[in-house]
């Protein structure tokens, strides 16, 4: 059973749903068919290869828990290359913003080789990553500058995670990185 499109801790909900299905009398074959046919929707959990890079685009929304879960997937992605966490700020955290972004930075240090943080809380993410010993952690307040730096550092075979709050428009950074046209 190959469930590669949905990796890591993010599969726990699918396992719970499968267990409920079994309890309600569904056959294991029907449940397996449902799991195998899973397709990511919109800007969530899109894992693919393009231009020699492994891309994990999860740009719809973000929270500290979601950041940790997607970073754990990045950490488990196959390949001989490095792992880049390209993370936008998590908006609407209120009083928890500083700690939430530091937490995301610490998780990036655990699962990635480099952090490219973007947005008003990028410095807090970088601080969290450096607390855990990550040397390659950078803060940007401009997506164009982030993409230029990322293009210098990332090489074919590397895995890149793009994630952030909807307002950070991380899909735009991904499109720029891949050389696609983007709206201003």
Residue ranges of model-derived segments:
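ATP-dependent carboxylate-amine ligase
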Residues: 6-9, 16-184
């Amino acid at each position: 059973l190959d469930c590669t499109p949905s990796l890591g801790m993010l599969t726990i909900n699918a396992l719970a749903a499968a267990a409920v299905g079994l309890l309600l009398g569904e056959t294991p074959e029907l449940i397996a068919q449902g799991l195998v046919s899973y397709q990511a929707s919109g800007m969530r959990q899109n894992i693919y290869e393009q231009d020699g890079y492994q891309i994990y685009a999860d740009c719809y929304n973000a929270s500290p828990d979601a950041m940790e879960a997607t970073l754990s997937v990045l950490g488990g992605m196959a390949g001989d290359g490095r792992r880049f966490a390209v993370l936008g700020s998590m908006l609407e955290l209120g009083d928890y913003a500083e700690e939430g972004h530091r937490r995301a930075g610490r998780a990036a240090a655990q699962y990635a080789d480099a952090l490219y943080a973007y947005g008003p809380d990028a410095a807090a993410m970088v601080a969290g990553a450096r607390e855990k010993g990550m040397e390659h952690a950078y803060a940007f307040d401009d997506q164009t500058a982030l993409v230029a730096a990322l293009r210098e550092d990332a090489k074919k075979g590397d895995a890149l995670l793009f994630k952030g709050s909807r307002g950070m428009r991380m899909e735009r950074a991904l499109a720029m990185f891949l050389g696609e046209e983007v709206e201003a």
